């Protein structure tokens, strides 16, 4: 990364933290809670970048295996919907960007056991969504800017692979490590892409050199 790009990235992160810090003064700060013994319904906010979104897939499979019949609603960007909308065990796959009426109606009408934000750092968009969603327990990865509007703050190790960090929620429900790689079957149906069951996933947006 060039010095100019590094400075721009630092400025962007500082700006984002300032916005989220300000939102924390406006939004209701939540008390700490315990995770429920079982999860019957959950809403998950998927990250914006394509690589980060794909790396969420093993977590989704493990979540559905751990809680058969769980109602999973997933929020993502419009350009990432194709990754998730064909997964049979996802009840609703809706885009939060651009903001739209279907998404607004969903987050205002549903009551979830758990809201899960697996993003390791602050996001003003995710903060706004979290504040609007009705959930008994709101869960994030530990971050001083995120924590005020969440009930549960999971370990957030920036030296772990992102896919492993995503699964911190399931570590509280007996998930054994390492997690199992998984892609939906339709990934193998794309022409001239993945032709067999063995694959390598590269995350080009890793935020730490150890990843």
Task: Label the predicted regions.
Residues 1-211:
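Catalytic machinery of carbohydrate-active enzymes
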């Amino acid at each position: 990364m060039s010095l100019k790009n590094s400075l721009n990235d630092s400025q962007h992160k500082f700006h984002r933290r300032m916005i989220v810090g300000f939102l924390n003064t406006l939004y209701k700060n939540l008390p700490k809670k315990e995770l429920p013994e079982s999860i019957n319904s959950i809403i998950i906010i998927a990250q914006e970048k394509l690589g980060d979104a794909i790396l969420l897939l093993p977590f989704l499979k493990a979540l559905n295996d751990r809680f058969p019949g769980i109602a999973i609603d997933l929020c993502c960007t419009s350009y990432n919907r194709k990754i998730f909308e064909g997964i049979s065990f996802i009840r609703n796959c809706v885009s939060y960007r651009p903001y739209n009426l279907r998404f607004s109606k969903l987050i205002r009408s549903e009551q979830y056991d758990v809201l899960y934000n697996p993003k390791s750092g602050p996001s003003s968009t995710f903060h706004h969504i979290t504040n609007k969603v009705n959930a008994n327990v709101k869960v994030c990865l530990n971050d001083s800017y995120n924590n005020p509007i969440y009930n549960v703050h999971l370990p957030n190790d920036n030296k772990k692979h992102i896919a492993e960090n995503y699964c911190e929620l399931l570590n509280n429900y007996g998930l054994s490590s390492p997690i199992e790689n998984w892609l939906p079957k339709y990934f193998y149906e794309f022409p001239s892409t993945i032709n067999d069951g063995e694959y390598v996933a590269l995350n080009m947006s890793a935020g730490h050199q150890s990843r």
